[in-house]
């Protein structure tokens, strides 16, 4: 399984509120792209402004969390994925994502990459 991962930092001039508003629109476009390419799962998440995140960062000396993370799960290979992205429907969504990124993403401090999923586990909570 292939995952297209986007770890996004917001442009410095955007407030968290402005980023979140634009992130929803960006996420909708990622979901639409996922539908076009036959993805079997799409995840779009935004980091939380909570004390725990700051505490972990200070304790560990780590970088700030990404503002948003988008993952598109695809059952084919990397060459198949890139071939599908060239088709008119998916290409239109990619073009819109690139346009949205101009006003949203601090590209030099973000990252975009393909990954394989090596371990997966699902748990269900016992009923109350």
Regions found by a protein language model. Give the residues of each.
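Macromolecular interaction modules
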Residues: 1-128
